[in-house]
Regions:
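A short glycine-rich, Lys/Arg-flanked "PGG" loop and its adjoining helix->strand segment in the class I
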Residues: 137-149
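A short SAM/SAH-binding and catalytic strip from SAM-dependent methyltransferases
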Residues: 120-134
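A short acidic, Gly/Pro-enriched loop at the edge of an enzyme's catalytic core
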Residues: 112-121
Length: 248
């Protein structure tokens, strides 16, 4: 069976056909390539004395690469990885002439170490797409291994506690079971962890553990947390956002 995050290839194919250049344009933040909250947090992180000021950066789940291109304006050379071959092709097309590279790769696989060592690793909303505990453990362990000693890991992810009343109002048709969101999909049975609810099939879409549980996952992989920001749910967004910077 397929991993739920492998469905991103179909989404990027649809984006390409519609002329949509980045995930934010397609999803939550209309018309913005890198949203203001992300820029604010990354700007604060990059200003810290414990943050590398130059070197090699890798973005995990880079999509079409807007965040990586933004970071690489700050004296970094970059590599973006993603499981979607269409996303990687789009990223390469949008990054011609810049000091960034892209390749198809899966951060949850053991062979990810072949991509090299880095001073900075950034997860721009990839983690919450990884559902199974086994894959999340691999995500954190592999991220640690990709960094040089003293390298910095930045995670930005959705988390709980969620406002379930707002979820019902805002996320029409979706389900929230425990710490996993599910979306209706006719081919859900092709994917790990699908659910059948009232005669309809749903596939896992997002894993949103309690923010304290995510901090525990980060520490268990060997990271030292240096900075974190946590936003509350709102009437427009039932899930919370966690941003963390941690040293390897």
């Amino acid at each position: 069976m397929k991993k739920p995050y492998e469905r991103h290839e179909l989404i990027y194919k649809s984006m390409k056909n519609k002329g949509v250049r980045s995930w934010n344009e397609n999803q939550r933040i209309k018309g913005k390539v890198v949203d203001a909250e992300t820029k604010r947090f990354l700007t604060e992180v990059l200003a810290q004395p414990w943050c590398p000021k130059s070197g090699k950066v890798i973005e995990l789940g880079c999509g079409t690469g807007p965040m990586l291109r933004w970071i690489c304006k700050k004296d970094f050379s970059g590599l973006g990885i993603d499981v979607s071959k269409t996303a990687i092709a789009m990223a390469k097309e949008q990054s011609k002439g810049l000091n960034v590279r892209f390749r198809r790769a899966d951060i949850c696989r053991g062979d990810i170490k072949r991509v090299g060592k880095f001073d900075l690793a950034v997860d721009g909303h990839c983690l919450h797409c990884i559902i199974r505990p086994k894959d999340r453990k691999a995500f954190f362990e592999n991220s640690f291994k990709l960094l040089r000693k003293g390298g910095l890991f930045v995670v930005m992810t959705m988390c709980s506690p969620a406002d379930r009343k707002v979820f019902l109002n805002v996320c029409e048709g979706q389900k929230l079971r425990g710490y996993t969101t599910y979306s209706p999909y006719d081919k859900a049975r092709e994917y790990e962890g699908f659910l059948a609810i009232n005669g309809r099939d749903y596939m896992p879409a997002r894993k949103v553990p309690h923010w304290k549980s995510i901090l525990a996952e980060i520490r268990k992989a060997g990271f030292e947390i240096k900075l974190l920001q946590y936003s509350k749910a709102s009437e427009q967004d039932p899930l919370r956002d966690l941003a963390v910077a941690a040293l390897a």
